[in-house]
Amino acid sequence: AHLNEHMLFKGTEKRGAASINNLLENVGGELNAYTTKEETVVHATVLKEDLRRAVELLLELLFTSTYPDKELLKEREVVYEEIISYKDSPADSIYEDFECRLFEGHPLQYPILGTRKTLSRIESSTLKEYLHKWFIPDNMAISVVADMEESQVVKIVERALRKYCPGQHCDIIRESTPQPLVAGTAGGRTAAGEAAPLDWTPVPPFRIEINKKHHQAHCIIGTRAYSYTQERERLALALLANILGGPAMNARLNTVLREKNALVYTVEACFNPYSDTGLFTIYFGCDKPLVERSLRLVRKELERVIEAPLSSRALANAKKQLLGQLAIASDNSEAQCLSMGKSMMIFGYIEPMETTRSKIESLTSSELQRVAQEILAWDNLSILIYK
């Protein structure tokens, strides 16, 4: 999927790589893409008068890419360098290493970038087969944020679809009644659209220390968590992650490890839901002799949220902080566009901000405590340390 994302920009039935790059850049636009564990996203930012140009180019890339052999040879080397660069950054590579170990036996164990061995086996024919299997309209969502009349946008998109996907119709999604998700059906679909069954036995909690030639130690503490289908628990854990290690300087772990004890520069808590499982992690980097003390303080903070419910004031403040962060993020048109597309792919609808706000506001301290007890119990957590 990741190599395919790179190769989409290397040639279509009517354009070479340079022409693809120039088409939007010549009018001040941007064209980019990224791959996650469960999706590929190709996106463009342009002036509204250039929307047609952008939409047609995106569909041209997705449906008529040719994967020239000479470009594939070069792009393999580019991805090799990307892998090396990633491995040279322990703060990044430890996340990948942790997921590989935590999700052993599950598709999530595989690194997005691949390996030199797996990349060497991928030929142009492999990528073409992948394109025709997965890049079909039933697997896609087109998201547009623009200061334009909806009818104008629909006309542009449907015209491009007729050009590159004859017979395909554009279903317009505004606000709709959410349908209950079934575990395993958000993302992770087969080419025919049905849920891909998984036969997977989770690995038991582990603690692994790996000697690395780095000046600093890096540590991840984490566990499997909730999927997209578990809405109340997912929202509660997202709020807990923000309380413990969100971007604010007053996050609890940052206050204890950095501000009070000067043990770390960076500490963060992250929750990533997937279609059939999820991942909760806490990461910090510190001087090697300080690892155990830092771990003890992290454990103490986790035990605080497990043993005692948040006060009504602390809960209200935490909700206000998260809602403020979400509102500010939604002011970014590109972020809003990407979020809408992801919501369509996962849930089949776009949730208004007011609905999200109401759901977060309705969370109770007892719900957060129950989620903390289920996910954050120390004996359930796995630990990976680069020393």
Residue ranges and their predicted role:
Residues 1-24, 98, 221, 232-244, ...:
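Active/ligand-binding-proximal structured segments within catalytic/core domains
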Residues 3-4, 166-167, 177:
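Intrinsically disordered, low-complexity regions enriched for glutamine and histidine
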Residues 17-172, 209, 216-219, 225-228, ...:
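Charge-rich, well-structured scaffold segments of protease-associated domains
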Residues 54, 236, 249-253, 294:
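Catalytic-loop motifs flanking and including active-site residues across diverse enzymes
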Residues 172-178, 182-183, 192-250, 343:
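His/Glu-based metal-binding/catalytic segments typifying zinc-dependent metallopeptidases
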